[in-house]
């Protein structure tokens, strides 16, 4: 890629991003809560929401090209600047920025000096860590290489969102995360920064924990301690750049929880509430999550429980009835233009929340394809090679798994969380004792704990027990971090020495959490060195040796970019690395079985338009591997060009 082309692509990305961010600000104005931190969560949520919606609409119409996206964005910017209503809103941005900086400065000065120093060092080191890992390493997490980023690669290549032939049927799964990831690839036509797609959810989760802490009555500094604790949680920190969708579900869930708790707390404190904005923002967060991963439905009972019981007695139910009536009244008082805009926001949310399931229902008869759905053995939706069950056996199996993983002593904490919870030093060292103390002292923490537990049980009722099941509950450590925030405020003022000891323990635990995630707890120095020796734009996932069979690197080495590369893997095999980091390699699935003759396999390759066929141990069925080796040994029409790479003569 020439410097001129790179500049043009970056300019297109800047124009498109500017349009989305300004549009998000216009949409944000009627949704404001009046709490600066929560307003930050709402704005970030809207930015992610509108980016995903823009990508989906452009992709469905075949417009996922930098120039086309920039042209649409430029036209949108012209409309925003020309329309009197939006132009007036945009003029307020400088004043809003000034006000926001003033709030940040006030919070900063309110923090103790040691906490300011810790924050500055933590933000600096975290930013450096994120930047280095995103720049140095290609994607390497298993599910991303099978289907998450495979969708992204195909959409980027094709310029449109569509289904394509592949043995990995999980490409049918809800793909709102992939929409956001595509925003980080389509302009550069490269995956060099695709890992950064997880950072908005990471920031949203941290800010939401801070907001929940404030709604629970903690001071700003205590809420910030809780937010820092969650930011350092290894499972959350590692997942942020792991190119998977679970951090996004966690971020949206915590944002919805922060919004719901804020509405629950408003009337009791005498503060005015933007009921319409709070309810709509909560709905958008949950709809965005629904189009990301279906298990958000299993988290809802816990969220509802917290919202319903946040106030004692029956006052919460009356409070929510008042919020609903206020929201209707506010909507009626809005101008026609404002009502239209809010209606379009809700329609966009419904589209993002339901598109993937409706598409699957139309095409396969099952909205949750490729998963069959059964409840205690009774089938609800039959079509699919995988099964999503709601069964007590799964619940008990997952609880046994959690008990065995508790303490994170079995294995290192890694991106897929094999045999660990990933909760880390802060949770087990300080957060867990703080939670036990808080359950005795604070009613609202008991309600919060009950809701978190209900959501945890909901996920474990349906999730298949496995070594990796804790990645679905990376939001759960936030409970212990909030308990720590409450303890921080209620620590007796006279026990200064003990308080300093607690601060030292907190800093030490944060440092240990950070250190263990520097290399994802698995990437060796040699693996870093092998990547850094390559130019930044040539760090293909196929040549990263962490978990990659040799045949993928052979494909990069021996197959020309302009050739069509055939592949044969099973339904959990790597596909994404075959596209290369710049998405220059066109690929095609070549189905065959061990019963096919060598000539039949070669004919199948010819029908697909390719001379090349890649297979790999652990990714291709053993019987197919054996068949190709036999064809090569017998000197038939197929020969092995390099390990795992076959060509027709």
What positions do the PLM features span?
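Membrane-embedded, hydrophobic transmembrane alpha-helices
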Residues: 1-107, 118, 463, 601-605, ...
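Hydrophobic, aromatic-rich transmembrane alpha-helices
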Residues: 26, 209-210, 316, 404-446, ...
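Transmembrane-helix signature of polytopic, membrane-embedded enzymes
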Residues: 33-42, 192-193, 209-234, 251, ...
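Transmembrane alpha-helix segments characteristic
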Residues: 45-49, 121-127, 224-230, 284, ...
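Signature aromatic-anchored transmembrane alpha helix within multi-pass, membrane-resident enzymes
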Residues: 113-123, 275-285, 300-307, 326-329, ...
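Membrane-proximal, lumen/periplasm-facing interface regions of secretory-pathway glyco-
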Residues: 139-143, 148-150, 506-557, 571-575
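Hydrophobic/aromatic-rich transmembrane helices and adjacent perimembrane loops
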Residues: 148, 153, 246-249, 289-299, ...
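Extracytoplasmic
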Residues: 556-606, 625-633
């Amino acid at each position: 890629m020439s410097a001129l082309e790179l500049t043009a692509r970056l300019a297109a990305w800047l124009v498109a991003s500017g349009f989305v961010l300004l549009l998000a600000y216009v949409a944000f104005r009627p949704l404001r809560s009046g709490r600066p931190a929560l307003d930050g969560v709402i704005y970030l949520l809207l930015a992610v929401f509108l980016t995903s919606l823009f990508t989906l609409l452009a992709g469905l119409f075949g417009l996922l090209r930098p120039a086309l996206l920039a042209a649409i964005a430029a036209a949108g910017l012209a409309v925003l600047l020309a329309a009197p209503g939006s132009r007036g809103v945009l003029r307020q941005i400088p004043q809003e920025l000034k006000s926001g900086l003033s709030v940040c400065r006030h919070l900063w000065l309110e923090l103790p000096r040691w906490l300011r120093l810790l924050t500055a060092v933590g933000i600096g080191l975290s930013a450096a860590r994120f930047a280095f890992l995103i720049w140095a390493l290609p994607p390497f997490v298993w599910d991303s290489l099978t289907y998450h980023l495979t969708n992204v690669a195909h959409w980027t290549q094709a310029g449109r969102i569509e289904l394509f032939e592949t043995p990995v049927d999980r490409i049918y799964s809800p793909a709102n995360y992939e929409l956001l990831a595509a925003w980080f690839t389509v302009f550069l036509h490269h995956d060099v920064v695709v890992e950064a797609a997880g950072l908005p959810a990471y920031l949203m989760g941290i800010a939401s924990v801070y907001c929940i802490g404030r709604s629970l009555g903690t001071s700003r500094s205590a809420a910030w301690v809780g937010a820092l604790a969650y930011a350092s949680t290894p499972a959350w920190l590692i997942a942020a750049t792991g190119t998977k969708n679970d951090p996004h579900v966690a971020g949206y869930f915590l944002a919805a929880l922060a919004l719901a708790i804020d509405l629950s707390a408003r009337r009791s404190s005498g503060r005015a509430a933007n009921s319409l904005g709070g309810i709509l923002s909560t709905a958008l967060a949950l709809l965005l999550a629904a189009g990301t991963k279906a298990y958000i439905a299993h988290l809802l009972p816990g969220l509802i429980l917290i919202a319903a019981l946040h106030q004692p007695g029956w006052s919460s139910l009356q409070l929510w009835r008042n919020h609903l009536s206020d929201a209707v009244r506010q909507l009626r008082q809005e101008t026609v233009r404002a009502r239209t805009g809010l209606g379009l926001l809700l329609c966009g949310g419904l589209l993002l929340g339901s598109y993937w399931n409706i598409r699957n229902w139309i095409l396969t008869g099952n909205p949750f394809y490729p998963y069959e759905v059964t409840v205690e053995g009774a089938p609800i939706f039959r079509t699919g090679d995988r099964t999503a069950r709601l069964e007590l056996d799964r619940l008990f199996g997952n609880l046994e798994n959690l008990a065995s993983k508790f303490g994170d002593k079995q294995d290192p904490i890694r991106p897929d969380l094999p045999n660990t919870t990933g909760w880390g030093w802060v949770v087990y060292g300080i957060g867990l004792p703080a939670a036990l103390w808080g359950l005795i002292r604070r009613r609202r923490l008991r309600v919060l704990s009950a809701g978190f537990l209900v959501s945890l049980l909901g996920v474990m009722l349906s999730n298949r027990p496995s070594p990796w099941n804790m990645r679905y509950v990376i939001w759960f450590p936030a409970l212990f971090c909030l308990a720590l925030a409450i303890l921080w405020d209620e620590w007796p003022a006279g026990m200064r020495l003990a308080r300093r000891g607690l601060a030292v323990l907190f800093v030490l635990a944060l440092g240990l959490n950070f250190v263990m995630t520097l290399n994802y707890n698995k990437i060796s120095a040699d693996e870093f060195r092998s990547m850094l020796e390559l130019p930044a734009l040539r760090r293909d996932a196929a040549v990263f040796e962490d978990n990659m069979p040799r045949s993928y690197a052979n494909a990069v080495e021996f197959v020309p970019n302009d050739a069509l590369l055939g592949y044969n893997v099973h339904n959990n095999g790597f596909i994404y690395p075959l596209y290369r980091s710049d998405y220059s390699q066109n690929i095609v699935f070549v189905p065959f079985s061990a019963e096919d003759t060598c000539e039949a396999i070669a004919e199948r390759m010819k029908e697909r338009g390719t001379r090349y066929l890649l297979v790999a141990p652990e990714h291709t069925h053993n019987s197919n591997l054996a068949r190709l080796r036999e064809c090569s040994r017998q000197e038939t029409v197929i020969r092995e060009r390099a390990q795992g790479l076959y060509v027709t003569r």
